[in-house]
């Protein structure tokens, strides 16, 4: 029984470690992807909007 308990515990610890590593990798990948996508989308939208506004103001002034 002692040996069985030990192996078990070992398999459980291995499963937990693998699960934790996978979850961490997934969360990191999701965060990185989300940040990159959000940043690129926001940057493009903001840049385009600011450029249009700036060009309109310049054209009106000139």
UniProtKB/Swiss-Prot annotation:
Molecular function (GO) terms listed?
DNA binding
Keywords, A to Z? Chromosome, Developmental protein, Differentiation, DNA condensation, DNA-binding, Nucleosome core, Nucleus, Spermatogenesis
| Localisation | Nucleus; Chromosome
Give any Gene Ontology cellular component: nucleus
In the UniProt record, the signal sequence range is none
Q: Which domain of life is it from?
A: Eukaryota
UniProt note on tissues of expression: Testis.
First-listed, main subcellular location of the protein, grouped into a coarse class: nucleus
One biological process term from GO is: chromosome condensation
Region annotation Disordered: where it falls in the sequence: 1-62
Provide the function of this protein.
Protamines substitute for histones in the chromatin of sperm during the haploid phase of spermatogenesis. They compact sperm DNA into a highly condensed, stable and inactive complex.
Family as reported in the entry's similarity comment: Belongs to the protamine P1 family.
Q: What is this protein called?
A: Sperm protamine P1
User: Which species does the entry assign this protein to?
Assistant: Petrogale xanthopus
Q: Supply the gene name.
A: PRM1
């Amino acid at each position: 029984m002692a040996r069985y308990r030990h192996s078990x515990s070992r398999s459980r610890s291995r499963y937990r470690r693998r699960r934790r590593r996978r979850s961490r990798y997934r969360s990191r990948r999701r965060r990185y992807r989300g940040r990159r996508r959000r940043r690129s989308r926001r940057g493009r939208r903001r840049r385009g909007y600011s450029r249009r506004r700036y060009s309109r103001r310049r054209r009106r002034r000139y």
